[in-house]
Amino acid sequence: MEKSCVSFYGDVNIGADISIDELRESVDAVIYAYGAGTDKRLGIPGEELKGSIAAAELVAWYCGNPDVHPDTDQPAGDRLMAADLQELITSSRHAVVVGVGNVALDVARILIKSVDQLSDTDMADEVLDCFSRNTVTDVHVLGRRGPAYTAFTTKELRELGQIADVDVIVDAADLELDPSSQAVVEQNKVAARNLVVLQEWAARPLSGASKRITFHFWSRPTMIIGDDRVTAVEIERTMIDSNGYVVGRGGGATLPADLVVRSVGYRGLPLVDIPFDDSTGRVPHAEGRVIRDGGVSPDEYVTGWIKRGPTGVIGTNKSDAVETVTSLLADVRDGAVKTHSRSGDLDRLLAQRGIRPLGMPAWHRIDAAELKLGASHGRLRTTLAHRGELLEAAEKEA
């Protein structure tokens, strides 16, 4: 980002400040890398009750996304999400997290930690203040398959067992492997390591800690119970049938719950005038080249989750980007991408509309402001979560 040949345009809304067609006319090629912006639903009764939320909403809030931390001059309706999340954190004892990926683990970890254990993070002040009043004592993590099929990494899993004053509870019976699970563990080193960690926890006596994280494998929610607000979750036991599908097998339980967080995957969203396959939640492509109107677009490319779906880690995104950039460079070499002298076209268009994009100097001023605020609190950094304070920091000279 610091190279002279790279320009950063922050605070520019594609589709509002500038259309896709105008952007394409201002540059030689466009790479779409805007990720998967929404979550997958559970599709069960009670999912709309107060207290049933998406992990994406909760993570955006505690990570300081300004879209979830509106300024006071924004319409009241835009503030409901943050206000509701804060109310849930400070009034819930029992939380149920549905999913067994790294996001689900992160949610469980954040919900169960004390504010002192979160004080070395870069959370915004108002988020830390909310967690100082956190009342959650029990987190239940549900996985519809067995431990061999979890999607988290061992490092993130093991950290849960190192949180002070927290017992991690695992039923040893859930860790018994059927032939298909055994095959997965034998072929997947991460799954094998995760199983060892879970077995250690299952064998470890409880310490009488004041908080608990309980894993429920082979379990899925069938109904969220409550009148105006979540009060419990019905779960059923599951198994994998002969066709490899997860099916119910009877039995189950009712878990007390004040908060239900679904973390069963993300899904891409369409942006105005960008090709989108609603059946997959992705931009259609061929080796990173966007498919538009049934053919390969001559100047549009795609990478990341909006290209392949919400899977993998940073390393996966790197190899994914290599494929896209390789296609772009090949097209430039072969003349499929027409290069023109367009220097300044985008700047002139934005200036004509009175739009002042934030460049890298502005980004550095925001960075400095967050470091300064963090230092004043004895922390490395404190996130600025409101758009107004971000823009103020961006404009402020050192």
Feature annotation, model-predicted:
Residues M1-L49, T214-H216, T222-I235:
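Feature captures the FAD/FMN-dependent oxidoreductase FAD-binding
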Residues R289-A398:
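C-terminal, flexible cofactor-proximal segment of oxidoreductases
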Residues S26-G35, V96-V98, L255-G265:
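Short hydrophobic core segments
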